[in-house]
Amino acid sequence: AYYSPSQDKIHLPSPGSFTSEYAFNATALHELSHATGHPSRLDRDMGGFFGSSQYAYEELVAEMCSCFMGVNLDQTASPDHINNHKAYVQSWIKAIRDKPETLIRAIKDAQSAAAFMDWKAGLITDKEYSQTMNSTMEIATRSRDRDAR
């Protein structure tokens, strides 16, 4: 499964290709998270190549967003799936150790992506979406201000 920014298209195998419905949904949410970064949506920097720090950052955002959104699914993640999420996020831990503020920024971007998907799905109102986006922007600003000191 992958998201193509140039085509603005998600390529997702059929549900039968996955080990479970949860695995399919988690993967779909991960790829949808990437799609929120498109310039016509939240406009995240998605220009990184595989192995670059920008690529790692975007993967961290998408995986965290997938986990945030997965809470809303009426499904229980198996221990294997939880370990898969954990391993995926741990694979990007070096970037976080090198620049701890990266984690704060990634959480903010993951929350923004989750709010965007909730808003587009009609799960939250325009007002709730605006409030969420404003609060995540305030957190990002405070984090940047602290880092500048």
Spans of features found by a protein language model:
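Active-site scaffold of zinc-dependent metalloenzymes
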Residues: A1-A23, T27, H38-L42
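Glycine- and acidic
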Residues: P13-G16, D45-G51, W92-I96
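Post-HEXXH active-site segment of zinc metalloproteases
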Residues: Y22, T36-E63, P79-V89
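Residues on a specific face of well-ordered alpha-helices
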Residues: T27, L60-C67
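Long, well-structured alpha-helical subdomains associated
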Residues: C67-A140
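Non-Sec secretion/translocation targeting segments of pathogen effectors
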Residues: M137-R149
